[in-house]
Amino acid sequence: MDSVMVKKEVLENPDHDLKRKLEENKEEENSLSTTSKSKRQVIVPVCMPKIHYSPLKTGLCYDVRMRYHAKIFTSYFEYIDPHPEDPRRIYRIYKILAENGLINDPTLSGVDDLGDLMLKIPVRAATSEEILEVHTKEHLEFIESTEKMSREELLKETEKGDSVYFNNDSYASARLPCGGAIEACKAVVEGRVKNSLAVVRPPGHHAEPQAAGGFCLFSNVAVAAKNILKNYPESVRRIMILDWDIHHGNGTQKSFYQDDQVLYVSLHRFEMGKYYPGTIQGQYDQTGEGKGEGFNCNITWPVGGVGDAEYMWAFEQVVMPMGREFKPDLVIISSGFDAADGDTIGQCHVTPSCYGHMTHMLKSLARGNLCVVLEGGYNLDAIARSALSVAKVLIGEPPDELPDPLSDPKPEVIEMIDKVIRLQSKYWNCFRRRHANSGCNFNEPINDSIISKNFPLQKAIRQQQQHYLSDEFNFVTLPLVSMDLPDNTVLCTPNISESNTIIIVVHDTSDIWAKRNVISGTIDLSSSVIIDNSLDFIKWGLDRKYGIIDVNIPLTLFEPDNYSGMITSQEVLIYLWDNYIKYFPSVAKIAFIGIGDSYSGIVHLLGHRDTRAVTKTVINFLGDKQLKPLVPLVDETLSEWYFKNSLIFSNNSHQCWKENESRKPRKKFGRVLRCDTDGLNNIIEERFEEATDFILDSFEEWSDEE
């Protein structure tokens, strides 16, 4: 009985029953889990990453034998102050790569295994056949002949050459950078490396097919590009060469000037041909010939001292759009670092970060097939830092932040980039607006047919000025007989010949501030205004009962191709003096006020006619326009008089202040003053009171009450 009771108690125990059910549920879950795992389907099988670029290393070309080409020392001073194209240039780059762990070569002896990031590409001498793809046989034989020349002969050829030097190792050394550049490009094209850096010398982009020049013996990049196109016709049909050396690569350009397989783009100082190599071939309007027309682009710096802002602007506005449209199979950078900050030859301020950013952008072209080949660069520290930044980006590092990302490009550079875009838009769709205004094609010159169905804006501006001055102040036209100019070129107050005191205002056609429609190119008339800088001076003179002559010099007459506003200004002022002003019986005091380029007419008149009896002062607002010297043909003392009686107001950033900060322009330019602001409208507003006070002083009409 007791046992029956115990059994019944156990069966009726709720805790025991719950425990049993939990265990059963757990066993069931385990069973279901096992069944689920055994039946789970494979959707994507495990596989190797389908990428080719990232796993590859960056190739590196370097060979100590390239340092054997050196200048023969003829004095102790050449030893302590070596030639800029110093053999140590490539050593310093190789050394900084090792110091930063990009290569593993603690002895700097050129070991074969460079580590996990870079792959050594053996350097070989280019063959004669490879060099002859670019250079003439005569040039090759001349460089080869230097091997057996005497010291005296080598010095003689160095003296005769165009900024080149020779020794007995020059020929052997010069074949190595050619061969190294070829092998660096081959390694990229064949997929053995993702990109490559050729640390080579002597440089090459100045070497023309028939002659050495500018420290260059053979054109390394041109030889490499020619041979790659020849040997890899299926995989490489188009090559883009980007030359960011501060000097124009005249040799490279000449090698491909008639070739549509190579797009050559060069960013360099030009400055009206004053900067080496100083040939017209470096001008921005040199676009190629024959099949190569449109495949040459020179982005010329009109001033020195350019930096990150200018190079980034050029890349964003010109280089990258052209590169994307060209779709190259290989990109080669002619990588001179003489635009780097600290290089005394280039005198520019490009930072290592900027070189990194430019490299990063070019990596986006040609599926990353990029080869960087050293050209110039003569500050050993600057060239090393810049090359390190480029190498890091090649390996895969993002570029460093730009030191001053908010800096604006120089105005002269912005204008030049616009000229390049307008010119190149003839060949490249990326520079043409797909929804442009159908009324005119602004890439074509304005001609009679366009004028016949459209109304030139500068004509409308002058007509508005004429109506205003006529309606408000009774101005009349002063005829310019036999001069092919608009009738309203010269306006004046009535009875001007009877005036004792005359203000003569000579100005360019007024500017317009306007919002432009980015799609159609039209301007928003409701928010557009004419900036008439001359009106304040006219009203000021009228308040004092002065006679006023207002001279408007058109920017262009459209019809004649050889029209020059500057020359027209000179002719008009001479005409006014010879036919009107010198015959005015009452005139005793004249003040000239020039605004813009047209002020050159005033300076021309003062040098060609003796007006000092009545001319009391000259005020010129030139903004960013070029200074015009007074050339005295009547009296050598005119320059001194002009300096004492003139005020020439320039932009704060005018080029005359950059050339030599410590020196003022010479007296023949007048008394040139640097304003605090830029832009004609701003400097006139800033210096209006100073200018008018100077006129009153010269007229001897100043009083304390005024």
From Swiss-Prot:
Its EC number is 3.5.1.98. It catalyses: N(6)-acetyl-L-lysyl-[histone] + H2O = L-lysyl-[histone] + acetate. Its main location: nucleus. CDD domains: HDAC_Clr3. One of its GO terms (molecular function) is identical protein binding. GO terms for biological process: epigenetic regulation of gene expression; negative regulation of transcription by RNA polymerase II; negative regulation of transcription by transcription factor localization; positive regulation of transcription by RNA polymerase II. Keywords: Chromatin regulator, Hydrolase, Nucleus, Repressor, Transcription, Transcription regulation. One of its GO terms (cellular component) is HDA1 complex. Residues 1-36 are annotated as: Disordered. Pfam families: Arb2-like, Hist_deacetyl. Residues 1-24 have a biased composition (Basic and acidic residues). InterPro entries: Arb2-like_domain (IPR019154), HDAC_PDAC (IPR050284), His_deacetylse (IPR000286), His_deacetylse_dom (IPR023801), His_deacetylse_dom_sf (IPR037138), Hist_deAcase_II_yeast (IPR017321), Ureohydrolase_dom_sf (IPR023696). It is found in: Nucleus. Responsible for the deacetylation of lysine residues on the N-terminal part of the core histones (H2A, H2B, H3 and H4). Histone deacetylation gives a tag for epigenetic repression and plays an important role in transcriptional regulation, cell cycle progression and developmental events. Histone deacetylases act via the formation of large multiprotein complexes. Present with 3050 molecules/cell in log phase SD medium. This is Histone deacetylase HDA1. It comes from Saccharomyces cerevisiae (strain ATCC 204508 / S288c) (Baker's yeast).
